[in-house]
Amino acid sequence: MVDHSTCRCARTVARLVPVIAGLLFLSAVRPVVAQESARDIVDRVDRLMRGNSSRGTVRMDIVTEHWSRAMEMRIWSLGTEYALIRVTAPQKDAGTATLKAGNDIWNYLPRVDRTIKLPPSLMSAAWMGSHFTNDDLVKESRIIDDYDIEIGFEGAREGIEVWEFELTPKPEAAVVWGRIVEQVRKRDLMPLWARYYDDRGELARSLRFEDFKTMGGRLVPTRMVVEPADKPGESTVITYADLEFDVPLDVSFFSLRRLQREAGSD
């Protein structure tokens, strides 16, 4: 019999992420030129968040109406298509892992020694019990292709020069959000926040990027906070403890065999 608490932990993943994998990758910033379009700028921001390869250690704190929990994880990523996320603490969840390869996601549940490929029906399920979904992990890498992008605001907000981008889905795009608004700091292309709206135009969740620090020789937002609009007081906070960039990884690292390794063996 499958331990449902373990399944919930494993089933339940922009920027990272949304979000988690995305923040592992940052590269050098060059100045923005005036003729760049909104799409060009968002594409550059996306590339800053998704370099060649990286690995890091993160802590995820989840607060819901009925419970709260903290988890520690190791993360490896290669480009936009590959990511491996392994829980290292608490001990009861250690070894639980998620592998992304292209559009496919597998979860490994060490308690029952079982690997599960997520079916389409579970793509909207919460990842690791958080306020992120499995679909976030797959779809975030295609934001430039799936959305039309315009600059909704350009100027100073609270003394900081920013862009605010309006993203609306293309007619043929199979996406969850009816609209996304993103704020980006001009001077270094650091994302400040994103707001996600449903197809009725109502705010569904918000994402904040905070605590900008230098890690691995690069400026990164080391803390992400996602809050669901319909659940006041609930949140998922992801905090980066360390990051390394341009590490030696190739596609063979992101295998089902690697997914099933014990925590601490990588």
Model regions: which residues?
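Bacterial N-terminal signal peptides
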Residues: 15-28
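Gly/Pro-enriched, hydrophobic low-complexity segments
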Residues: 114-117, 135-140, 158-256
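N-terminal secretory signal peptides that target proteins for export/translocation
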Residues: 1-13
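Sec/Tat signal peptide C-region and signal peptidase I cleavage site
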Residues: 30-34
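Acidic/charged, solvent-exposed loop-and-adjacent secondary-structure segments enriched in E/D, K/R, S/T
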Residues: 109-139
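N-terminal mature ectodomain segment of secretory-pathway/periplasmic proteins
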Residues: 36-111
